[in-house]
């Protein structure tokens, strides 16, 4: 059975870092945000937080709250891998989409970090769609919560706290991923 491990969490909680760890373990990674960023560019827009948020909201409004997840399903299947990581679930409709597609093979891991910690990370990472103030991060949180992010986080199978050192977080993510790798290889 194919296993999908998806990361959910508020912006800058550590989803991308967790996905990097998975990639280092040779687990294919599908980044849901890339679907949005691709659509932003397709529409000829500047890839900033405002446009990214607008396009993400528009896709969900026009195609349904699971629009991004549905666009990722074929990418997941095309990997041909028994274990795939999905970075960036944003709402409960996406969780439901993946659970419908992959059944018990879908595992949702929430990553938690406090607002102040997340904002300090945003300031360091320098992505074009990042916000430049803590109020901007709060607004992004509110936008993503409006997509059902809170319900998605509550629906997670496992939570990893990312409030400590990078080394601690990497170890925690490694432990969780290795647990699923091990259970996958035993079948």
UniProtKB/Swiss-Prot annotation:
Keyword ATP-binding: yes
Binding site for ATP: 9-16
InterPro entries per record: NTP_hydrolase-rel, P-loop_NTPase
Record-annotated membrane-spanning stretches: none
Pfam families named among the record's database cross-references: AAA_17
Annotated SUPFAM superfamilies: P-loop containing nucleoside triphosphate hydrolases
The family this protein is said to belong to: Belongs to the UPF0200 family.
Protein name, as recorded: UPF0200 protein MA_4660
């Amino acid at each position: 059975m194919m296993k999908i491990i998806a990361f959910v969490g508020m912006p800058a909680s550590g989803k991308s870092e967790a996905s990097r760890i998975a990639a280092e373990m040779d687990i294919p990674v599908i980044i849901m945000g890339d679907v949005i960023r691709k659509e932003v560019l397709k529409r000829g827009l500047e890839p900033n937080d405002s446009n990214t948020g607008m396009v993400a909201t528009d896709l969900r409004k026009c195609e349904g709250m699971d629009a991004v997840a549905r666009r990722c399903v074929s990418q997941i299947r095309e990997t041909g891998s028994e274990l795939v990581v999905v970075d960036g679930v944003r709402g409960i409709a996406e969780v439901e989409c993946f659970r419908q597609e992959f059944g018990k093979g879908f595992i949702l891991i929430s990553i938690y970090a406090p607002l102040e910690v997340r904002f300090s990370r945003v300031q360091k990472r320098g992505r074009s769609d990042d916000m430049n103030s803590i109020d901007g991060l709060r607004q992004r949180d509110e936008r993503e919560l409006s997509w059902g992010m809170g319900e998605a986080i509550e629906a997670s199978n496992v939570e990893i706290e990312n409030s400590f050192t990078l080394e601690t977080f990497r170890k925690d993510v490694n432990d969780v991923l290795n647990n699923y790798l091990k259970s996958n290889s035993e079948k």
